[in-house]
Design a protein with these regions (language model features):
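Extracellular glycan-recognition regions
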Residues: 5-219
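Sec-dependent N-terminal signal peptides
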Residues: 1-3
Length: 219
């Protein structure tokens, strides 16, 4: 008798959070200098003259995938520099392990050295570098491996073009992708398994859309 093969249905991925940007109630802004973070018609616009980090309030836990669309605006405005499409994920603060938002951070980049987090700075240094770092909670050291210090023009920013960002923290697998291209694929033997997501930029003008957090399938 021939044996029957029964296909197992693959469960859909779970959307843990979704923000359609009708308000800023899910976000905490840290700005080095006065700037603008505003929402309108499903778009979150950040227009700032200096450093700015916008933290998503809920704590996330691994496995997790974070997706959003970002457009670096170049339309002649004072901050339209096209630089620093940056982000933290799985971030905790060594100064306040029990309450992430109890630590004082001004938006100045140096204030984030004591995070434990994954970080990508795409198009940093006036759109000349794209870097991945694993922050270790040290006030001085921010380790940077040579293979995570990229300067190829194909991994830099293009003005006024939507960039679909995908971040993954799934066990020891840490990844960063842009428009379907895997840019960083990092194996972490001691992975960060919980923490916050933060969008980071400095002296730039950016529009964010379609922010979603997924619980990826596990095999």
């Amino acid at each position: 008798m021939a044996s029957a093969f029964v296909a197992q249905a693959v469960p859909p991925e779970q959307i843990v959070y979704e923000d359609r940007f009708q308000s800023l109630e899910n976000w905490v802004a840290e700005m080095e200098q006065p700037g603008t973070a505003s929402v309108r018609a499903g778009v979150l616009t950040i227009d700032v003259p200096a450093g700015c980090t916008l933290w998503f309030k809920p704590e996330l836990s691994s496995p997790v995938r974070i997706e959003y669309e970002a457009t670096m605006i170049a339309a002649g405005g004072p901050n339209d520099r096209v630089s620093d499409l940056n982000c933290f994920w799985m971030a905790t603060d060594a100064r306040a392990p029990g309450d992430f938002f109890a630590a004082r951070r001004s938006g100045k980049f140096g204030d984030y050295n004591q995070l434990r987090a994954y970080y990508v700075g795409q198009g940093g240094n006036s759109n000349t570098t794209t870097r991945f770092r694993r922050y270790i909670g040290d006030p001085v050291l921010r380790p940077l491996l040579p293979e995570h210090d990229l300067k190829d023009p194909t991994v830099l920013l293009t003005p006024n073009v939507p960039q679909r960002i995908r971040l993954l923290a799934q066990g020891s697998t840490i990844r960063y992708s842009n428009n379907g291209r895997l840019i960083f694929d990092f194996y972490d033997s001691r992975p960060y398994t919980r923490g916050r997501f933060g969008f980071r930029t400095t002296r730039s003008h950016v529009e964010l859309r379609n922010f979603r957090v997924y619980r990826p399938r596990t095999r």
